[in-house]
From Swiss-Prot:
Chain's gene name: hfq
Protein name: RNA-binding protein Hfq
GO terms under cellular component: cytosol
HAMAP family for this protein: Hfq
Keywords, comma-separated and alphabetical: RNA-binding, Stress response
One GO MF term attached to the UniProt entry: RNA binding
Subunit comment: Homohexamer.
TM helices/strands, residue ranges: none
A Gene Ontology BP annotation from the UniProt entry: regulation of DNA-templated transcription
InterPro entries in the cross-refs: Hfq, LSM_dom_sf, Sm
Entries under NCBIfam families matching the protein: Hfq, PRK00395.1
PANTHER family listed in its UniProt record: RNA-BINDING PROTEIN HFQ
Amino acid sequence: MAKGQSLQDPFLNALRRERVPVSIYLVNGIKLQGQIESFDQFVILLKNTVSQMVYKHAISTVVPSRPVSHHSSNTSVGASVGNYHSGGVSAPAAQQESDGTE
């Protein structure tokens, strides 16, 4: 489990420390926006006009409003990690591939 947290924790911590506004896309397509107030192994506390506890298992994508630097040996994180999309690519748009007609 520690290996899985080696990218997630520094990334979320950098977003929290720098108070970077984020868009969080849930697996059902809902978009939440705010700043990460805190997080643990299972939840992220997202603050906007109110604080919301968002369970990580419900999150598809976390999109920062600007690039952040975090302590990781891999600097091209956006190109290799499925839970991070740079450039504002939204998860719902990427889900629809075809309508099944030929």
